[in-house]
Design a protein with these regions (language model features):
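Charged, amphipathic alpha-helical coiled-coil/dimerization segments
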Residues: 78-138
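N-terminal helix-turn-helix DNA-binding core of bacterial DNA-binding proteins
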Residues: 27-71, 77, 83, 99
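Short, locally clustered residues in the helix-turn-helix/winged-helix DNA-binding domain
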Residues: 23, 49-53, 114, 141
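Short amphipathic alpha-helical/adjacent loop interface patches that line ligand
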Residues: 18, 22, 44, 66, ...
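N-terminal leader segment of winged-helix/HTH proteins
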Residues: 1-42, 142
């Protein structure tokens, strides 16, 4: 709390809206996971999205990115492999290490889901000016930086 009750109320309103946004994000992740594969869990969807975005990565990098336990990452990766969405290959730079590579099926399904999610976001933000959207992106960047 600060000495400015108006500022405190405004920050509380922002916090409330972030809670709503985070809840909505969890719902979208769950829906998106099911669109990729009926057996895919939301955590697996997030990992798969990151693997597709990166082109290839490793379990250690994913564990750091999502601050997840390595055993949880391993379980999700095993499921992604079983569903035919990810392949584990020897790292070309270090044959002892393994890299995760999305399959073409995964790339196609993630692209479709992302297109639908982006259309939803575009509809939600319709009517906002480019300047408003840039300001929103700036505020989100500040919040994400901590």
């Amino acid at each position: 709390m600060t000495a400015d009750p108006e500022l405190d109320a405004a920050i509380a309103a922002v916090e409330d809206q972030f809670g709503i946004v985070f809840n909505r994000a969890r719902i979208v992740w769950a829906e998106s996971a099911k669109l990729v594969h009926p057996e895919l869990q939301p955590a697996g969807y997030k990992l798969l999205s990151s693997i597709v975005r990166a082109g290839s990565t490793n379990a250690h990098a994913l564990a750091e990115l999502y601050d997840m336990d390595k055993s949880a990452i391993s379980r999700q990766i095993r499921q992604l492999e079983e569903l035919g969405l990810v392949e584990s290959r020897a790292d070309e730079r270090d044959g002892r290490a393994r890299v995760l590579v999305p399959t073409s099926t995964a790339r196609d399904r993630i692209a479709r889901v992302r297109a639908a999610n982006q259309a939803r976001l575009r509809n939600a933000l319709a009517g906002r000016s480019v300047e408003e959207l840039r300001s929103l992106a700036d505020v989100l960047r500040i919040v994400a930086a901590g």
